[in-house]
Amino acid sequence: EIFRQYSNEGALYFSDDFELSDELKVNAGLRYSSFQHRGDINLFTYLKNDLTLSNDNYRNIEPRLSLRYKLNTTSSIKGSYSENYQYIHLASTSSVSLPTDLWVPSSTGIKPKFAKQYALGYFKNFNDNMFETSLEGYYKEMTNLIEYREGYLPEDNTNSSSDDSFTFGDGDSYGIEVLLKKNRGKTTGWIGYTLSKTTRYFDEVNNGIEFPAKYDRRHDLSIT
């Protein structure tokens, strides 16, 4: 037997730029997303082909807004806010990394992941734009996250689409990003460093105490 799940997803996006003054520019956008889960379970055997249909539909509006305030000819402040729905979840265990982690579509029992993100940064160029520097902070809050219940292994769910396999919770992520970029000369490239923290909160995991996300990376240094 092979169990499969199917879904359709589509989106429309609109955005526009507004110059409110010589110093202040705004970009506003709106994304409309639609998701349909087609079939709770598709069961194929040598003798029978059964299809159980589901009419789980999600339609959401996702606003985005960014602002840029020019301090002078070489420096500016930028801020942004965005909302995002994710309809496909990566179901994993918090304790171990296994190659059997599964992508699971939203359904009646599994709501779409929802995230809000805020960002604010300072940007400055030097030597006639030869060098670019920036310091940016961000905060992201997430709801409707999923993980396997404690004591439940992903391979136990390989032949089942039961929503009872999962537990649901929230999370957040925040950090500071520093970037130095050289645009001209014999040597070009950039150096970036990120200090961040990503946590999860599940009532049924770790006794309800917050814990680091599976893919939390406290320090990240990139050189190109």
Place the predicted regions along the sequence by residue.
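Outer-membrane beta-barrel translocator domains and adjoining extracellular loop/strand segments
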Residues: 1, 38-47, 90-98, 103, ...
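Extracellular loop and loop/strand-boundary signature of outer-membrane beta-barrel proteins
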Residues: 1-2, 15, 46-54, 102-108, ...
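Signature of Gram-negative outer-membrane beta-barrel scaffolds
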Residues: 1-72, 87-88, 205
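Residues on the lipid-exposed face of transmembrane beta-strands in outer-membrane beta-barrel proteins
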Residues: 12-16, 65-69, 110, 120-124, ...
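Outer-membrane beta-barrel channels and translocator barrels
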Residues: 21-25, 70-74, 115, 126-129, ...
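Gram-negative outer-membrane beta-barrel transporters
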Residues: 22, 139-141, 159-224
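Transmembrane beta-barrel strands of outer-membrane/channel proteins
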Residues: 28-34, 79-83, 101, 122, ...
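Membrane-embedded beta-barrel scaffold of Gram-negative outer-membrane proteins
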Residues: 70, 76-82, 86-88, 92, ...
